[in-house]
UniProtKB/Swiss-Prot annotation:
Domain of life: Eukaryota
Key words of the record: Acetylation, Activator, Isopeptide bond, Methylation, mRNA processing, mRNA splicing, Nucleus, Phosphoprotein, Repressor, RNA-binding, Ubl conjugation
Molecular function per GO: identical protein binding; mRNA binding; pre-mRNA binding; protein domain specific binding; RNA binding
Organism per entry: Homo sapiens
Name of the molecule in the record: Transformer-2 protein homolog beta
Subunit composition and interactions: Found in a pre-mRNA exonic splicing enhancer (ESE) complex with TRA2B/SFRS10, SNRNP70, SNRPA1 and SRRM1. Binds to A3 enhancer proteins SFRS4, SFRS5, SFRS6 and SFRS9. Interacts with CPSF6, RBMY1A1, RBMX, RNPS1 and phosphorylated SFRS13A. Interacts with SAFB/SAFB1. Interacts with ILDR1 (via C-terminus) and ILDR2.
Protein's cellular compartments: Nucleus
Name of the gene: TRA2B
Length: 288
């Protein structure tokens, strides 16, 4: 009886110990579970915060890039629009000439049919023709105020055209009708009214006209060496630009002629040396 009681008492103690141990273990586990859950939640929160920060940074970078590209495109478009508007304004401003000569009437009549005046333009002259020769020819038609041959500034040679100033318009008309087409020094000259009344800036080139069949080969070769390819259609547009047509440029040409005659030798020479100018002058007026 005593043995069975002791055995039962031992079983009870072991059960109680196991219960207490299980209870103690369950208490420990119960104590440790909230700490672990808290650490997991903290790690999740930190991860979510880091993700949100990275996402916000990437979003801010994207937005800044978009804003930068938009601002650059806007600035470029603004610059382009400003440059276009500036170029348009510049074209509008400079489309019309602001020179004081543009508002004035520079020509008397048109190039095809100039109005009659006292100044005649003589074109297609030879290099050997002088102002004295022209005066002898045109003085038959009336009193002459002055005769001016236009010379090149660099070479000091005749540019192949001159201006004859009459005192009367009627005499100029008669001289134009009679002397136009006349052969002078082996050249068939052209005579017409001058359309300019003020001098122009000289341009390089010599108007020599068209040689006639009676001129010698040496003279043709000499004259062609200074010809710049002018034809009869350009005698207004090019010849007048170089000479100071019709009412102010003849004095400068006369001064240049005097200086050229005083300082430089005579241009009438040939390949063999100096050639005297004692040649017979003959001009044939136009037959009616």
């Amino acid at each position: 009886m005593s043995d069975s009681g002791e055995q039962n008492y031992g079983e009870r103690e072991s059960r109680s110990a196991s219960r207490s141990g299980s209870a103690h273990g369950s208490g420990k586990s119960a104590r440790h579970t909230p700490a672990r859950s808290r650490s997991k939640e903290d790690s999740r929160r930190s991860r979510s915060k880091s993700r949100s920060r990275s996402e916000s940074r990437s979003r801010s970078r994207r937005s800044s890039r978009r804003h930068y590209t938009r601002s650059r495109s806007r600035s470029r478009s603004h610059r382009r629009s400003r440059s276009r508007s500036y170029s348009r304004d510049y074209r509008r401003r400079h489309s019309h000439s602001h020179s004081p000569m543009s508002t004035r009437r520079r020509h008397v009549g048109n190039r095809a049919n100039p109005d009659p005046n006292c100044c005649l333009g003589v074109f297609g002259l030879s290099l050997y023709t002088t102002e004295r020769d022209l005066r002898e020819v045109f003085s038959k038609y009336g009193p002459i105020a002055d005769v001016s041959i236009v010379y090149d500034q660099q070479s000091r040679r005749s540019r192949g055209f001159a201006f004859v100033y009459f005192e009367n318009v009627d005499d100029a008309k008669e001289a134009k009708e009679r002397a136009n087409g006349m052969e002078l020094d082996g050249r068939r000259i052209r005579v017409d009214f001058s359309i300019t009344k003020r001098p122009h800036t000289p341009t390089p080139g010599i108007y020599m006209g068209r040689p006639t069949y009676g001129s010698s080969r040496r003279r043709d070769y000499y004259d062609r060496g200074y010809d710049r390819g002018y034809d009869d259609r350009d005698y207004y547009s090019r010849s007048y630009r170089g000479g100071g047509g019709g009412g102010g440029g003849w004095r400068a040409a006369q001064d240049r002629d005097q200086i050229y005659r005083r300082r430089s030798p005579s241009p009438y020479y040939s390949r063999g040396g100096y050639r005297s100018r004692s040649r017979s002058r003959s001009y044939s007026p136009r037959r009616y």
